[in-house]
Each structure stands twice: as C-alpha cells, then as structure tokens.
Amino acid sequence: MKEKTYEGTKKTQNGLKRMVFSALAILLQAVFMVYMFTRLNEYAAAINATTSVLAIMLVLGLYNREQTASMTTPWIILILAFPIMGVSLYLLVGLNGAPHKMRARFEEVDSMLLPCLPENADILSDMYEKVPQATGISTYLAKNAFYPVYQNTDVTYYDQASKGLEAQLSDLSKARKFIFMEYHAIEDKESWHRIQQVLTERVQAGVEVRVFYDDMGSIFFIDRDFSEKMEKLGIKCRVFNPVAPAFNMFLNNRDHRKITVIDGKIAYTGGYNLANEYFNVTHPYGIWKDTGIRLEGAAVKSFTIAFLEMWNASERKVPREVDVSQYLLHYDYEAKQSGYIQPYADSPLDNVQVGEDVYISMANKAQRYCWFITPYLIITDEMSHALTLAAKRGVDVRIITPGIPDKKPIYSVTRSFYNQLVKHGVRIFEWTPGFCHAKMSVADDIMATCGTINLDYRSLYHHFENGCFMADCEVVHEIRDDFIRLFTESAEVTEKYRTGRSARRRLGQSIMRLFAGLL
C-alpha cells in the first residue's frame, strides 16, 4: 500500500515539475517581450507609437470579430488600459490561434472522414413528423456540425460513473476487432489498471487497440513514458498536444472528449475520465457525481469518426488517404428502443460553437422545463440571455452546480453568475453531497443531451468536446428522473442571491466576471 502511495505521489510530483517548468518558461517569454518593449528607452517614442497603432488595430479587429462580446471585451479593456502589457499578452495567448498548419490539418482530415457518415435525411423528415420541437436542433447539428441523426440505436444511461465503468469493462472484454479510447485524463492507478488488463488481453487475442489522451489533462496522473509503456503492451497510444516549455498558441486548446468505441457496434461517452476520483475510489471533494451513456447500434458510426478525426489529425503528416471502411462495417442490428440519437463533436478551430448552440437551442425550444447540471457555470451573455428569457416565458429553468468545489477560485466565479440568473427566475441548486462533474441537459420529457461539455468558456470555446443529443426515447425520462433525485439532495440558493450583495462582493464579482472569458 505504501509503495502504491509513493508511486502516485511520484507521478504527481513529476507532473507538477513538468507543469511548473513549462509555465515558467512561457512566463519568461512573456516577461521578456514586455521587458524589451519597456527597456529600449532610446526607441521609446517609436515603441509607444507602434504599440498605440497596434493596440488600435487589435481593438478594432476584436470589435469586428465574429465572437461573443464576453470573449472580446476583457481583451479590449486590457489593451486600452495597459497597451504594452495588453498587446503583448494578446499576441501570446489571445489570438485563439491554433497555427494555420494545425487548422489545415484538421480541415484535411475532416474532408476525408465526415463524408463517410450517412446523411439520413429521411430520418430527419420522420423526426419532424413525430417530434418537431427537437427537429430544429438535429437539423442544426446535421448541417453545421455535419453529424447526422440516427434511429435503430439502444441507449443505456448510467447515473454513476462506476456503473458505466463496470459495463465498459464487460464490453471491452468481448471486443473482437478494434477498441478506440479517447480521454482527457488517464490516471495510472487501480481503475485504469483494470482497463489496461482487459486491453492487454484483447491485444493478445488479435484485437487492434488504440488509446488517445490529452497531455495537460493527464499530466499529474501518469509518467511521461506512459505512451511508451502502452506501446510495449501492443496498445497503440498517442498524446494530444504535449505540454512543452516553448510558447505555443495551441497549448490552450485541449482534448476534453471522452469516447470509447468497441468494434464499431458499441460506444460510451459521458463526463467521466479514467481516474480513481471519478469512480469514488478516492474522495477528494466529497462524493463525485458523474454520468455516462452506452450506445449500441447505428449511431456508433459518428463516435468512430470523431475518434479517427483526432487520431489522424494528431499525426505530424496527414496521410493522403484515410481508409476507415474496416471501422464502419455494416452489421445487422435491431434496436429494442425507439427514438432519435445524434452523437456530435465540437472543435475550437472553427467559428461554430456547437456545444453552446445546442444548450441555447434547448432553452429556446423548451416549453415546460429545461434543466442543466454542470461543474462550472461561467457563461456568455448569449447563454445567460437564453436561460433568463426561457424563465421569463414561464419555463422552469434550473441549474445544478457543485456543493463542494474542486477549484475554489473558479467556484467563486461560478457563484458570481448566480445573481443575474436568479433575479430573472432561473433556479440554481448546489449539490450538497460533493462535486457534480456531470454535463447534461433535459427538457420537456422530449429531449436531452449528455457528454463532456461544461457550461463554461473553456468547454464552449477552447476545447475539443463531444456530446450526444437524444429525442423521443426512453433515456430522456431516465435522465429526468435522475435530475429529480439530485434536486432532493441539493440546496436551492435562489433566495439568497435574490437579495442585495455587499459593495465589496459586487466589486469582486464584477472583476471576476469581466475576465471570466480569459479563464
């Protein structure tokens, strides 16, 4: 036991060293840039003039940018108030700029993979006849995210991540052709060891196994040579966007997706990563609430493509052709459930905020109720307006947030959004047993979504994410029932935030809110 504790501590220390070293190196680059601006006194006039012109150009560019004001306003204020520092920081971290080569790489991969998905226009037409209230969202996803809607798919809902893990292990052990796993965080401890054992057995049985994880998300959980260890076991392994001590504009864009695909027949997604705390093996923040879903049937194709997009785009050189036919084989399956299932993915490399648009659309389409659960509540003006407008229309809008935070500064920002929502009729509940990490929404007993997308700027604008929109199916009622249970375990904070706040608190929260888009 002591040896395991020591190994875990060592991994955390190694990850911390990597993170601190990289952060210091990047900070030094930023400091050096500011230093060069300020110390060249003999060129002060020219530097000030150049900085002023550049600041004006950047502000005008930001003002005319096709982006929410919540994202651009903090930069405009920072650049105008402190031109040298503001311009320097914006050029370093504010351009939302994955390098052109990276964008081109993803566009090239998408051009090869997305056409492999069926259009399913007939299903969309059928959906319009049966559930017109949800059809607009599915049409949006099909035409803008390029992920179609499906039928003939069974969905199983897991109200606890541990239940999802057990089902996942069972399905993994039965894999015959391939296993794809993509996660934001993997922790090299008991929960992962159970998965690794099954994956190793499947490799020995001739199954192709691929594992893909985000370096930043896993940096405190695994050793740097984790991918090499997997390769030695016969598991193909890749790391997304490795943390490096050199400045990289793409560093802020992380892979937050959570996908498992088995033989192209079964897929899993949800809020949980592959680490002990998600399964309540450890309890750093009280009870951990997470959820997941299992798909079996036609809709699995979309998650297969979503995985292959990230896998192939992460190669240094994109192959001229990507043959996915062996992973999209047709097989006879007759679903026991009815309904419409639509997996989708979101990318920060385009100007389409798929995750936010789905949430806003659900609030706009809701007629009776629209409920959300999220670990963080740091939203744009557009999202806030959609929620409050729905409440003003008489829709029962509720949001569940954690009772115990995992990041106290971010929790303070989350709470700073309460007042503007509750005074317009949105009800907010804090889940008192611990930390809720689930990311879901359900509306009117008709539609729901479950996936990886938090109600915060990072998920909605900066990360690669995924979700699954579901309409007119049994799982919607199961998700609704879980929400009802959660409300009974939560403390409503609405009344407290309807009353006035102290001037000090208002000032502090205003500052946090102003720069929330930069978090």
Task: Please give the residue ranges for each predicted region.
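Thr-Gly-centered strand-to-loop micro-motif
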Residues: 373-374, 401, 431, 450-451
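Extended hydrophobic/aromatic segments used for targeting, binding, or gating
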Residues: 382-385, 389-391, 396-423
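A C-terminal junction/extension of Radical SAM enzymes
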Residues: 421, 428-429
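Acidic, glycine-rich loop-and-beta core segments that form the ion-binding/anion-interacting portion
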Residues: 333-338, 346, 353-375, 381-392, ...
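N-terminal localization/anchoring segments of enzymes in phospholipid and broader phosphate metabolism
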Residues: 1-357, 361, 405, 419-423, ...
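Glycine- and other small-residue-rich loops at beta-strand/loop junctions that grip anionic moieties
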Residues: 184, 375-376, 410
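Catalytic-core elements of nucleic-acid end-processing and repair enzymes
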Residues: 439
